[in-house]
Amino acid sequence: DLLGSPSGARKQTLMLPIIYYAKKDIVDPNILISFPTNENIELHHIFPRAWFKDNENSNTFPNWYADKDLLRERRDCLVNLTPLAAQSNNTWKAKSPSTMLSNFTNKAQLPGKDIWTNRFIANNCHTALLNDQPESFMNFRAIEVAQWILDQTNI
């Protein structure tokens, strides 16, 4: 369901860690986005919708390209979303992850830092972002989120 389109209570449950575990904005790590905040927080498509459309080819999507419905579902799936401050969402807009990440200069934006790990973006996910590999990124991130959810249920 993390790579699909769940609805209702299932969607809300799966979104909880994605929305509430992140503490700082990616684009500007000085902006706190955790509750309570005065910032206007928006959900951002990590691989933006416009980017998906502009890069719809078999090189970018070797396993998904043949199925347009699957591509659309993956574009809007939960693991392609992350909370950002509204101003950061506007800065990122339709840019590829690699374009955005190449502009980061703050040490807090380095791989393995809280702004990534609190979003379930481990080093393998970060590498996929740097290489604009949405399939790898989403598969890796889905595993990270699912594992965290399972870990929370262990007694």
Kindly give the residue locations of the regions a language model identified:
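Homeobox/homeodomain signature
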Residues: 4, 31-37, 68-71, 110, ...
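Context-gated lysine
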Residues: 11, 23-24, 53, 68, ...
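Non-catalytic, well-ordered alpha-helical scaffold segments
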Residues: 12-16, 41, 79-82, 98, ...
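Intrinsically disordered, low-complexity N-proximal targeting/linker segments that flank membranes
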Residues: 1-51, 55-56
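Long, cytosolic, alpha-helical-rich C-terminal regions that act as interaction/scaffolding modules
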Residues: 73-76, 86-155
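A generic structural signal for ordered alpha-helices
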Residues: 24-25, 63, 123
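Generic structural "secondary-structure junction" signal
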Residues: 48-49, 80, 94
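Short beta-strand-alpha-helix junction that forms the catalytic/metal-binding core
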Residues: 41, 53-89
